[in-house]
Amino acid sequence: MESRKGIKEVSMNFLDQLDAIIQNKHMLEHPFYMKWSKGELTKEQLQAYAKDYYLHIKAFPKYLSAIHSRCDDLEARKLLLDNLMDEENGYPNHIDLWKQFVFALGVSSEELEAHEPSEAAKAKVATFMRWCTGDSLAAGVAALYSYESQIPCVAKEKIRGLIEYFGFSNPEDYAYFTEHEEADVRHAREEKALIEMLSRDDSDKVLEASREVTQSLYGFLDSFLEPATCCHCHKA
């Protein structure tokens, strides 16, 4: 009995550490999103962000596929598949919803597709992909959890800012955020359960994945507040 209690305490402590890492670099605390919440971003900054974020939006289903294809646990695969289907199934799917947001900012389809992603955007995607294709499935799921667990409150605040400060009135224009405000509550809950289910003496990798992902998210957002941001805005 004592042994089981000990195992549970270690597990809870491990998951608490994971959440602490995420909270320490929560995206809502980043100056870029704080400016978004206060209406202090320019339209050009939002356009640059929307175009550069597109690389991650397109890659997200691949992160899920990389983990799903290597997972032997049937129940875990079902949860991963549900998340993947949420991303890609139906019309509009999540990529389509992101495009609706981009177009509402005045960016054309041609401009979006021709955009050359920044080094920060590439680094973020590479970080996710490295963990999702690595030798620890739990660490791969932790990379996703470190992102998706933040999204519901981030999406809610983004919607408020878009309506209050940036003239968004058509719900279709911010439907991407509405969808994720709801769906990622479930995704994060399932991912946390998967981390505990799949973890095999690799808690250090799980925590390292979270540290690297949260740092890459901050690095990406940093790039829109630097003097070089204007380069994002004028790239094709």
Swiss-Prot record:
Fe(2+) 2 binds at E87, E148, D184, H187. One of its GO terms (biological process) is small molecule metabolic process. Its cofactor is Fe(2+); Mn(2+). The keyword Plastid does not apply. Fe(2+) 1 binds at E87, H94, H180. The record marks Y33 as: Side-chain cleavage. Binds 2 divalent metal cations per subunit. GO terms for molecular function: metal ion binding; oxidoreductase activity. Keywords: Iron, Metal-binding, Oxidoreductase. Its EC number is 1.3.3.-. Homodimer. Involved in de novo para-aminobenzoate (PABA) biosynthesis. Acts as a self-sacrificing or 'suicide' enzyme that utilizes its own active site tyrosine residue(s) as the substrate for PABA synthesis. The side chain of the tyrosine residue is released from the protein backbone via cleavage of the C(alpha)-C(beta) bond, leaving a glycine in place of the original tyrosine residue. Reaction requires O(2) and a reduced dimetal cofactor. Belongs to the CADD family. This is 4-aminobenzoate synthase. The lineage of its organism: Bacteria, Pseudomonadati, Chlamydiota, Chlamydiia, Chlamydiales.
